[in-house]
Every structure is written in C-alpha cells, then in structure tokens.
C-alpha cells in the first residue's frame, strides 16, 4: 500500500516511467471537490498545539479562474512517476508517493532535491527509520505554470499551480490547503497510494493534515512547505494519524471535561495510571519505564483536545509538540502495528 508525498519533479531511483496523461489540468473541480472536508488539522506557529477546521476540498474561484492549460512542451513530463525506493510489491508495502506544487517544468531538479530532503527527514525518525524496508516511495511530477504557491508572500498573491495549493485557506495565513480532486488525479498515477504529502514550493511556514478521508484511494493527505525547517515534522505527525491511528496529544480546542467512552486511539486513554495497570489496558506495560520522548511513561492529563478526562503517555512527544522529534513508546508501537497492517494488505 502507499504513503503519498506530493511534489513536482522526479526523484532518483530505479524504475522511472512515464505515466498516463494527468486529468484535471485546466478543468473545473468535480463534484467530490465541491464538498467540505472535515478534520483538517493545521499549525499556526504560535504554540505547540494544532487546530481543526472544516475547509473546502476544491480551490477557491479566484484561483480556479487563473488556470490555463500547460503548453505541449510542458505536458511531456507532467504525471511522470519515478521510484525513490522500491522494496517489494505494493500489495505488501506501505507505498509513499511524493507530488509537489508550484514547480515549473524548468524547476524539476529543484523539486528532486526538495523531495529527497523531505523523505530523508521522515526516514530519520523512529520507528520509520527501522521500518523503511516495509515502504515503497514514489514521486509523481506535477508541472505548474507558475513558480511558488498562492498566498505567499501575501494573501492577494495568486499562482497557477498543478494542485492549487494556497496559504490563507479559510482566512488563516498558515493553513496550506490543496485541491483534493487534483491531488487525487496525480496520486493515481503512482502504482499505489495510501498517504499523500503535498510539498509546496515555498519557504513560508504552514501546512495541513486531511484525515479520515472518504471517496479517495488514499488514507490521508498532508501539505507542507519545501524550504521551511519544521515542515517535515508536519508530514510525520499527520502520517502518524493515518498509519498508526494515533490521536493528538495536545489539550487545546475543547472546553470542559471529556465524558465519552474509552477512545480507540492507542496513545490516549480515560484511565489514570493505577486503573490502567489494574485493567491491563493501553500502555500499561510501559508505565514507569523510561521513554524516548523524555521522562518516564505515565498518564498525563490533557489530550485529544481536552484539558481534563483524557490522558497521554508522556509529558510531551511528536503528537503534542513539534519541538520534540520523538514518538513515545505507545505511539511507536501503534505505528509499527500500522506498518504491519499495510504489509499484510489489511
């Protein structure tokens, strides 16, 4: 199966092949794109916590109206697929595909360097590091007429790009949205796709995570900036939601006390430490033990957007704060279990 990172260009590796023509260049968004997508997570840079918003799946009219078809010479590379890493058949792998936005036909070498760097960042974080052999990594060229993306550096900047990526989505400067119908059309050029990461040709901080998607062949989409140091962590964090079925561990966004059932997510719980131990539930095996995210594993109140009623395993981790580049042990196990689900075709 596949994790897709979207970005214009061809990465090195074996097995490069031209894909069929990509649909959607210059076309209006379809019915699926007109719907609002819920559960979009984004980060404004003001603090460690993320936020949730409902945003349109299609680019706004002011961006669509600027679109023009690519010239014949530009279309030759549009949609071309290359393998950055191929370790086995897609039916037995987590397939990761990179496609990007805001790279012109003459900027494919720039994309190649950006994509290689982003994948290296992802692969440097455990448990991805120890399990890269369970992943295929593909790239798909997406040629844009303009360089850069809309909303950078100012809200009124409009660019004609392959995926319609834009800052100031839903009026929020750092929320970097994409046209999911166009993302879908490029992602389908790869042999398989489970998660999509859109790499925007920009140095501006921003991003978004589309989780719990329906009607698409992939399980999630994240967007990030190509030239911002923290952008790779957005991709890792968002991929963890879809692959490991992990919850956010920060506690901003909801008022009051959580009073719902025990969550299915492996890294949050309604049980304080003693009750968790007595029940043999969730991360009871790690309680009191040192954790790679820092300190010892316990039950720390405040998680899943609630300040009270939900507990997380550690004081902080990559599911709570981007200043930490480590997943805690329960989250690592959730990701490893997720890798196994993909490699066994589940």
Task: Cite the ranges covered by each PLM segment.
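Extracellular/periplasmic catalytic domains that process cell-envelope and extracellular macromolecules
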Residues: 88-91, 129-132, 188-193, 292, ...
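Solvent-exposed loop/turn segments at secondary-structure junctions
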Residues: 101-106, 143-147, 202-206, 229-231, ...
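Secretory targeting and sorting signals
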Residues: 1-21
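Short pre-active-site segment immediately N-terminal to the catalytic Zn-binding motif
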Residues: 110-111, 215-238
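Catalytic Zn2+-binding segment of zinc metalloproteases
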Residues: 239-255
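Catalytic zinc-binding patch centered on the HExxH motif and its immediate surroundings
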Residues: 148-149, 184-193, 199-221
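Propeptide-to-catalytic entry region of secreted or membrane-anchored zinc metalloproteases
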Residues: 26-186
């Amino acid at each position: 199966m596949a994790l897709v990172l979207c970005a214009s260009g061809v990465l090195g590796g074996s097995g490069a092949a031209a894909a069929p023509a990509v649909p959607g260049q210059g076309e209006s968004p379809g019915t699926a794109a007109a719907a609002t997508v819920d559960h979009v997570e984004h980060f404004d840079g003001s603090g460690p916590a993320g936020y949730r918003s409902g945003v349109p799946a299609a680019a706004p009219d002011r961006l669509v109206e600027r679109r023009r078809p690519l010239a014949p010479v530009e279309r030759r590379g549009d949609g071309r697929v290359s393998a950055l890493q191929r370790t086995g058949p897609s039916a037995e792998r987590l397939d990761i595909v990179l496609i990007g936005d805001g790279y012109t036909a003459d900027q494919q070498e720039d994309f190649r360097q950006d994509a290689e760097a982003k994948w290296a960042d992802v692969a440097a974080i455990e448990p991805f590091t120890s399990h890269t052999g369970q992943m295929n990594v593909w790239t798909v060229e997406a040629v844009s007429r303009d360089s850069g993306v809309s909303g950078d550096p100012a809200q009124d900047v409009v660019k004609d790009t392959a995926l319609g990526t834009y800052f100031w989505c839903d009026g929020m400067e750092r929320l970097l949205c994409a046209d999911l119908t166009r993302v879908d059309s490029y992602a389908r050029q790869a042999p398989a796709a489970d998660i999509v990461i859109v790499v925007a040709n920009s140095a501006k901080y921003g991003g978004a995570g589309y989780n719990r998607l329906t009607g698409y062949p992939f399980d999630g989409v994240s967007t990030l900036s190509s030239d911002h140091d923290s952008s790779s962590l957005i991709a890792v964090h968002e991929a963890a939601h879809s692959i490991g079925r992990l919850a956010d561990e920060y506690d901003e966004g909801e008022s009051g006390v959580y009073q719902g059932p025990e969550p299915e997510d492996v890294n949050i719980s309604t049980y304080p430490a003693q009750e968790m131990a007595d029940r043999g539930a969730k991360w009871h095996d790690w309680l009191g033990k040192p954790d790679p995210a820092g300190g010892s594993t316990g039950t720390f109140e405040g998680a899943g957007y609630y300040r009270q009623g939900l507990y997380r395993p550690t004081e902080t981790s990559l599911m709570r704060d981007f200043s930490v580049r480590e997943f805690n042990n329960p989250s690592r196990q959730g990701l490893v279990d997720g890798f196994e689900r993909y490699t066994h075709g589940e």
